[in-house]
Structure formats: C-alpha cells, structure tokens
C-alpha cells in the first residue's frame, strides 16, 4: 500500500530472518551505564532502544551474554552528519566526543567494579 502504483515494479528480498536480540536492563552493567550518563549530564537518562543495523551482540546474547551499545557524543555534533562519520569513507570522531566517550567508559568500568566488587 505504501508504494502505491509502484508495487508491480518492486521486488522485496528478505536479507535476514534472524529476530532482534535484546539484553535485560536490570543488571549491574546497565546501572553503571546509567551512572556514567548521569555523571556526564545530570539531566540525561538512559532508555533501551533499537537501531537499524546490527552488531556482534546478536551472536553473544543467545549464548547468555549481556551486550549493550552505548556512548556519549558532543552536543556540537551535527546529527544530520552523525551517521556518515562511522563505517565509511573518512570515518572520524571529533575531539570533544572522543574525550566524552573516553571519560564515559572510564566511569562505566570503575562504576561497574564498585557495583560488583565483593
């Protein structure tokens, strides 16, 4: 219906029939990520979501691993340009985002250790 009169000229091909995977949000790692986000921006919050594409997490989750994709990027990054910065020609990250994401993961790792250390 969405393509109207073009329907007869369009071929739809299934590229994958693997269902999406997900990780639970009631874990120490999720809590550590939330704390790291709050440390970077007290007004921010963490919410689960889906993205187009795939990661290696889809192979690890069925084996019992908890896998999250997370990061913090500079508010100066143009979101219209954001997607073109990864996995293509001229792959790059701005220095402010590099600092933010490095500090973020340092906070996640230290926070996770605090949450699970005996």
Model-derived features: positions:
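Metal-dependent amide/peptide-bond hydrolase catalytic core
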Residues: 1-106, 110-118
């Amino acid at each position: 219906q969405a393509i109207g009169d073009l329907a007869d000229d369009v071929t739809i091909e299934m590229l994958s029939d693997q269902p999406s995977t997900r990780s639970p949000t009631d874990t120490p790692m999720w809590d550590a990520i939330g704390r790291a986000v709050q440390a970077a921006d007290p007004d921010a919050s963490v919410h689960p979501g889906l993205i187009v594409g795939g990661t290696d997490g889809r192979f690890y989750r069925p084996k019992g691993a908890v896998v999250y994709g997370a990061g913090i990027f500079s508010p100066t990054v143009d979101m219209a340009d954001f997607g073109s910065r990864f996995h293509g020609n001229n792959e790059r990250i701005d220095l402010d985002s590099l600092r933010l994401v490095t500090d973020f993961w340092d906070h996640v790792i230290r926070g996770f250790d605090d949450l699970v250390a005996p």
